[in-house]
Design a protein with these regions (language model features):
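Glycine-centered tight-turn motifs at strand-turn-strand junctions
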Residues: 168-198
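Conserved aromatic beta-strand anchor motif in extracellular beta-sandwich/beta-rich domains
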Residues: 159-163
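Beta-propeller blade termini and top-face loops
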Residues: 1-97, 104-107, 114-116
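Surface-exposed loop/edge segments in extracytoplasmic proteins
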Residues: 19-21, 165-172
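Contiguous beta-strand segments within globular domains
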Residues: 85-156, 182-184
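Short beta-strands and strand-coil junctions in structured, solvent-facing domains, enriched
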Residues: 42, 116-120, 192-194
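Short, solvent-exposed loop/turn and secondary-structure capping segments
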Residues: 15-16, 54-57, 64, 121-124, ...
Length: 198
């Protein structure tokens, strides 16, 4: 696994430098320095005049081999989650009022999906875009078809959490999309009070 700072962003190679691709989310600007924080598997890139950027936990990139990415779906090994009580208080902010978004609390799982079933609505929109691109008329689908689209559920993934004895702890649901994504578990059991008064 290689990282490269360039005049046009940060690039990575998953195959010892044979192929390079730009890291998604990094701006197209000059990066002058890269530092790897080995304990947490974080990559820090210092740009020229724009500050610095942190890629939290790049360990999933190590498992993104051709074999793993060609599978229908792959769940990558997560890093150990830290159990602590998150605080909402700002505390003492000193002379400045600097606030940044904290990383997601709990266990964060990275996954890759090669294909996701499409819905009738997404297929219709794709077809309408092609017709629009070719400067053709877009037919009205009809009220029945639009009503059926509203009832249709989109594809989702369900992550099942179990303890070391195989006992069910919790299911976590997220809308599915093609490519890589992350889903987090806040280290809590499922609620035994699904309906609350009030």
């Amino acid at each position: 696994l290689f990282f490269l700072a360039t005049e046009f962003g940060i690039y990575t190679s998953l195959d010892a430098g044979n192929n390079w691709q730009k890291l998604p989310g990094t701006p197209t600007i000059s990066f002058r320095d890269l530092v790897i924080q080995e304990r947490e598997n974080d990559l820090v890139g210092a740009s020229f005049g724009r500050g610095f950027f942190v890629l939290d936990d790049y360990s999933a990139l190590r498992e993104m081999t051709k074999e793993n990415l060609s599978k229908k779906g792959k769940l990558f090994k997560p890093r150990d989650a830290k159990l602590f009580k998150p605080r909402n208080s700002l505390g003492n902010t000193g002379g400045q009022f600097y606030i940044a978004k904290n990383p997601t609390y709990g266990a964060v799982f990275t996954y890759h999906l090669n294909d996701v079933p499409s819905t009738s609505k997404s297929r219709r929109i794709r077809s309408e875009r092609m017709l629009n691109k070719d400067m053709k008329d877009i037919p009205f689908p009809g009220y029945d078809e639009l009503a059926a689209e509203m009832e249709e559920k989109s594809a989702s993934i369900i992550l099942t959490i179990k303890d070391s004895n195989g006992n069910h702890i919790r299911n976590i649901k997220k809308n599915a999309s093609k490519g890589s994504g992350k889903i987090a578990w806040n280290l809590r059991h499922k609620s035994y009070y699904p309906v609350r008064a009030g």
